[in-house]
């Protein structure tokens, strides 16, 4: 690379990733093969449109790549329809929402502070700006989704669309119950499985594909692919929907809202990376990987509990959990900064019914996907949890410096993918 400034910054980031314990639940490490595809000459090609229907010439091989990605996605998820063009999960959600409802319609989504996502109706996001939004949350007592309460809220607000899915909910989501609620109030159901896609395809979480009208996901996180989005559908893929005043099959509406509705040319180099990720996730080794992610995450959560920390909802069924720090002197922001000083990376996170602002937060979110990709097992994950607890309870900078040395020495033994 001739650009020394960028090269040196990339090298610094490479060293940071190697010498830090990565616990951000939305992050993971891709394979070298995926990185090679994303960094390939495919970035040169413009390919507006879809296979065999492009607005540019020279797309014959691009058509083959996208068709292969679609085929693998459908096989992996058991879907009848897949659009692999969304640049991100947020853009996948935007296109999916626009295919199902119109501006001014009503959306019922999960409260952001209870584990939802910005694109599920937040007032600062397109979903809350162009649509009328209502929210459900978790029970104050159990910190679990109360489906009876969701039904009650749905009957009160009569949404056109219900969004199921979360960014910081550590328990299994019952998508069938959400579909029953949606049918009860004549609403569409969109399931956002960005965080749990890997668990679903590996068989460790119930699938939304034949339950929801549309399912969206990112292709990174637990799926371990390149950064990007995807839209899927099962048995409802050809259901007729009212789109711009005309009846259209759902898949046609989605294709239109992705391109030209929300995007121009697809990122072909990323689509190639997605295709590789889907192939990797179809292997038996991926099921073993996800099983280990869940084991590692549970081990860490249980250790925190044994050390007197409260875990939101009491535990985890997936790849993440929230630690409640409200009884300590630390905010989530304090803990995030402190832990980064000892080479442990995670994020501050609001907890249900949080009294602190999101910029401070009362909790931290911990995920096990990335460390598992580096080969950490349950014993190693227990050591990670011990590092965190020691750092949170440290009384001096000398202690923190010692912990950092131990963290670096520990994590260097695990290769990057």
UniProtKB/Swiss-Prot annotation:
The modification N6-(pyridoxal phosphate)lysine is found at residue 221. Transmembrane segments: none annotated. (6S)-5,6,7,8-tetrahydrofolate binds at residues 112, 116-118, 247. GO terms for molecular function: glycine hydroxymethyltransferase activity; pyridoxal phosphate binding. Keywords: Amino-acid biosynthesis, Cytoplasm, One-carbon metabolism, Pyridoxal phosphate, Transferase. Its cofactor is pyridoxal 5'-phosphate. Its EC number is 2.1.2.1. It comes from the Bacteria. GO terms for biological process: glycine biosynthetic process from serine; tetrahydrofolate interconversion. It is found in: Cytoplasm. It catalyses: (6R)-5,10-methylene-5,6,7,8-tetrahydrofolate + glycine + H2O = (6S)-5,6,7,8-tetrahydrofolate + L-serine. Catalyzes the reversible interconversion of serine and glycine with tetrahydrofolate (THF) serving as the one-carbon carrier. This reaction serves as the major source of one-carbon groups required for the biosynthesis of purines, thymidylate, methionine, and other important biomolecules. Also exhibits THF-independent aldolase activity toward beta-hydroxyamino acids, producing glycine and aldehydes, via a retro-aldol mechanism. HAMAP family: SHMT. NCBIfam families: PRK00011.1 (NF000586). Belongs to the SHMT family. Homodimer. This is Serine hydroxymethyltransferase.
């Amino acid at each position: 690379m001739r650009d020394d400034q960028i090269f040196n910054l990339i090298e610094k980031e490479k060293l940071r990733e190697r010498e830090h314990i990565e616990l951000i639940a939305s992050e993971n490490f891709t394979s070298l093969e995926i990185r090679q595809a994303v960094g390939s000459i495919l970035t040169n090609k413009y390919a507006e449109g879809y296979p065999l229907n492009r607005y540019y010439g020279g797309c014959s091989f691009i058509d083959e790549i996208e068709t292969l990605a679609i085929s693998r996605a459908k096989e992996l998820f058991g879907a009848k329809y897949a659009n692999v063009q969304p640049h991100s999960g947020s853009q996948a959600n935007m296109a999916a929402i626009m295919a199902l409802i119109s501006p001014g319609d009503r959306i019922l989504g999960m409260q952001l502070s209870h584990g939802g996502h910005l694109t599920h109706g937040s007032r600062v996001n397109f979903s809350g700006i162009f649509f009328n939004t209502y929210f459900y949350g978790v029970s104050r007592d159990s910190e679990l989704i109360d489906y009876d309460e969701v039904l009650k809220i749905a009957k009160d607000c009569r949404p056109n669309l219900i969004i199921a899915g979360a960014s910081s909910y550590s328990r299994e989501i019952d998508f069938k119950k959400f579909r029953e609620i949606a049918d009860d109030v004549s609403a569409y159901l969109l399931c956002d499985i960005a965080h749990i896609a890997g668990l679903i395809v590996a068989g460790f979480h119930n699938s939304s594909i034949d339950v929801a009208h549309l399912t969206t996901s990112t292709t990174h996180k637990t799926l371990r692919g390149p950064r990007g989005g995807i839209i899927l559908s099962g048995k409802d893929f050809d259901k007729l929907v009212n789109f711009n005043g005309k009846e259209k099959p759902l898949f046609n509406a989605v294709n239109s809202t992705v391109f030209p509705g929300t995007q121009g040319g697809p990122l072909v180099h990323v689509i190639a990376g997605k295709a590789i990720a889907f192939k990797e996730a179809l292997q038996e080794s991926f099921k073993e990987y996800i099983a280990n992610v869940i084991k590692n995450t549970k081990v860490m959560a249980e250790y925190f509990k044994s050390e007197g920390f409260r875990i939101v909802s009491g535990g985890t069924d997936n790849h993440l959990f929230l630690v409640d720090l409200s009884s300590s002197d630390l905010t989530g922001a304090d803990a995030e900064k402190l832990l980064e000083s000892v080479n442990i990376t995670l994020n501050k996170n609001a907890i249900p019914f949080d009294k602190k602002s999101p910029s401070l937060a009362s909790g931290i979110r911990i995920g096990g996907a990335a460390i598992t990709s580096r080969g950490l097992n349950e014993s190693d994950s227990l050591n990670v949890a011990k590092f965190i607890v020691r750092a949170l309870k440290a009384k001096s900078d000398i202690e923190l410096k010692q912990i950092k040395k131990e963290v670096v020495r520990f994590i260097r033994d695990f290769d990057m993918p």
